[in-house]
């Protein structure tokens, strides 16, 4: 992978101890993944109500709580590694995809790429319509077919990402409540019952 110092977008606390520390949010089995995120600078990347590291860990925990397969959960942990349609900056460039795959596995990396590559303005409105099977890639500008399994994983990750932010920030929740309700309603047939119930509980 590229040098984290060259790829990370540090937050206000750029100076830190170089010794990686495991977040209490992660179970011990994921210590290696937590340390890798810190090497990439996720703990210095400012995000809603804290750091990107905190958000990534919490997103993964939601996906696990809802009973998702491990590749989907690991993709949730790394869903912003290449940046997203909602986050400026990235932890690594696309030339590091093989390195990310070595850490979380090829299936999880492919899902993390899919999430980061989504052109939200063009693809989100397609969800719930026949056009949902054609993905729009913001990195390449291309459109291509998406499998049902990949679309379901993408939607589940989307709900987890947005709900984690909504739970962490009252202002975010109030600002985006209506649009998220509409988006999740279109995803209803693609997400788990647990994700649907969590959305209803958080957004009302």
PLM region descriptions:
Residues 2-204:
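Metal-dependent phosphohydrolase cores
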